[in-house]
Amino acid sequence: MSGSNGSPRDLKAGGSLRGRVRVPGDKSISHRALLFGAIAEGTTTIEGLLPAEDPISTAACLRSMGTTISPIQSGEIVTIEGVGLDGLEEPSEILDCGNSGTTMRLMLGLLAGREGRHFVLTGDSSLRRRPMNRVGQPLSLLGANVRGRDHGNLAPLAVQGQRLRGAVVGTPVASAQVKSAILLAALTAEGSTSVIEPAHSRDHSERMLRAFGADLEVGGEMGRHILVRPGATLKGQHVVVPGDISSAAFWLVAGALVPGATITVENVGLNPTRTGILEVLEMMGASIEVLNRRDVAGEPVGDLQVSHGPLKAFQFGEEIMPRLVDEVPILSVAACFCDGESRISGAAELRVKETDRLAVMARQLKAMGADIDEHPDGLTIRGGHSLKGAELDSETDHRVAMSLAVAGLMAEGDSRITRSEAAAVSYPTFWDDLERLRR
């Protein structure tokens, strides 16, 4: 399987997949461990941190504000010397968030309450097109001052640190990024802050903030109401990052689709706010077993074993979307090989990811001959037709690149994928792992 950075990668169709694989550390948890470690007192050590572009962007921003963070390398424990809750310095340079929406959105919350300090955040051309008002607007209820293009919606963004005051904030969407930005800002506010979500989003921030010593309560129906009381000192911790279920999803779907396949994905985070993918695979009739369930540093973890079998069409919508939003691209590939018509709805959020993922997946799968209709909030896919090898393009999106790799395995005839290196944003060793499992 050829393809170096910038050159098209050949995807050979056919063959099977067998073996064990360990996916990189969870991206969401990696970002949060870096951010909370930076504003804690004392040393934080992180085991299993994802050594990919997005967390590296978060670390670079924190270093620019005076935080000492050891190099981020595969297999190495990362050490952070915390500067305390109000110890971040005004940087002398613009903070570059790269391609990482999580970095930019969480930084807005982290920096909003740094009174008297000024910060400018930017990112690559894709990130500069992504909406930031969904964070800036709720933060303004606490007194934050965020300015930028399109009335503060588009980067570059300027944050003028303010004295914040606690508030009751209802978030417009069930987004862990929005919620986490408000929680970070609330740590430096005067008075308590309550965050109320329309639906329960991933809860890594709440779990980890409590482990670091924040005064935080979770209540309401399904944990949709979070209360933060400022004033508690965060203390450095040892954080163990489990494997990212969003990266495991590619192997789970591939194992279910590819004839003769049996794959075990080891050490996967099974936080219940992230396991929507397992429910949809179950709905499809996929053969998946959870082995060796355990708890690691406050997060449920297990090994997932998947094997090939016949799959039936599925439907899901907004009720489950916060728990599998990143898995929609690979599930759209799965739908092409299910018996019947599958429908994904409530997924309008995907139009403002690294790319418009609904449009990109529809475009790329149609190039392979898929029977697929695009809707404002989702996709309808009629399965049971063969896909044909084609010239494909990730359109710079990491999840699209890896989803198309799985489609390419199942196609009749070989494919080529342009910009396959995008996978490195969340899974730097994806193509190597694919080669190994094919042997």
From Swiss-Prot:
Chain positions recorded as 3-phosphoshikimate binding sites: K27, S28, R32, S175, Q177, D326, K353
Subcellular compartments: Cytoplasm
Cited InterPro entries: Enolpyruvate_Tfrase_dom, Enolpyruvate_Tfrase_sf, EPSP_synthase, EPSP_synthase_CS, RNA3'P_cycl/enolpyr_Trfase_a/b
E.C. no: 2.5.1.19
Record: residues binding phosphoenolpyruvate: K27, G101, R130, Q177, R357, R399
PANTHER family: AROM/DEHYDROQUINATE SYNTHASE (PTHR21090), PENTAFUNCTIONAL AROM POLYPEPTIDE (PTHR21090:SF5)
Family recorded in the similarity comment: Belongs to the EPSP synthase family.
Name of this chain's protein: 3-phosphoshikimate 1-carboxyvinyltransferase
Lineage: Bacteria, Bacillati, Cyanobacteriota, Cyanophyceae, Synechococcales
Gene: aroA
